[in-house]
């Protein structure tokens, strides 16, 4: 098996830097759009054969060093009792706003309520045949709470902050329930065959460092500590966390994901030894001429200074209108420029 990705997660030496892309199975690939044209997004997420097919596309087309389960961070929230639709973004029919709403939420029976997720994982492990490892994933408790309380996407998520400040008992009860659900969900992914886990805290960076430490850190720490991590590394990605990386590290995780607002050398200094890092090319670089893409890849590699425990990725998900050939070129640049 190509173990570069897993070796890098554990900080072991590798022959070159492993590379994969957040949202690598997505709309920038014509092959993905051909599948997506036949079904809705939710149908794609819930049809194991199709979801496995699009999960494999970046491995075959781009040559990345890891596959990631095709799903959505909100997938496990729906069976908690929240009707979800995508129109086109995620919308919950009835947001969580009070203690009664929290009390109505249930912890799903994972294999009964979400069998398609684990079927996708099992299909992928079979189809990958150990060519590359498989990453499972989930949303961090705070990011899931942002959507559940707001009811949809937002730039500032006022409702979750209002709850956090004005109804701390409701907020705490919600976060406890989401954390328990997430722990069971991610452990079920590991049991089904996921070989690494990424926790996406897309909205953790909307909080001040003080509020993150008080209102988010305890829940994320409980989640990470509750995962079956003996042979399964955990990647913890908090978008916008450049000013609080030391706190993010306190939550645990074997790899800290970085966005493009912090350079790798600075992040390494803040995080200290003993933890791997992943990132952190600005996704919009992939719209540039290929000569510029190569320069930017080299810059990121130089910032890492050849240290072990590094996984090349974008600083967030690949954008849907990026030319697929540029994504492939970026992967090739990493492979060529980082080989020891």
UniProtKB/Swiss-Prot annotation:
The record marks 72 as: Transition state stabilizer. Disulfide bonds: none annotated. Substrate binds at residues 23-27, 72, 147, 202, 316. Keywords: Cytoplasm, Decarboxylase, Lyase, Porphyrin biosynthesis. Its EC number is 4.1.1.37. GO terms for cellular component: cytosol. Pathway: Porphyrin-containing compound metabolism; protoporphyrin-IX biosynthesis; coproporphyrinogen-III from 5-aminolevulinate: step 4/4. Its main location: cytoplasm. InterPro entries: UROD/MetE-like_sf (IPR038071), Uroporphyrinogen_deCO2ase_HemE (IPR006361), Uroporphyrinogen_deCOase (IPR000257). This is Uroporphyrinogen decarboxylase. It comes from Pelobacter propionicus (strain DSM 2379 / NBRC 103807 / OttBd1). The gene is hemE.
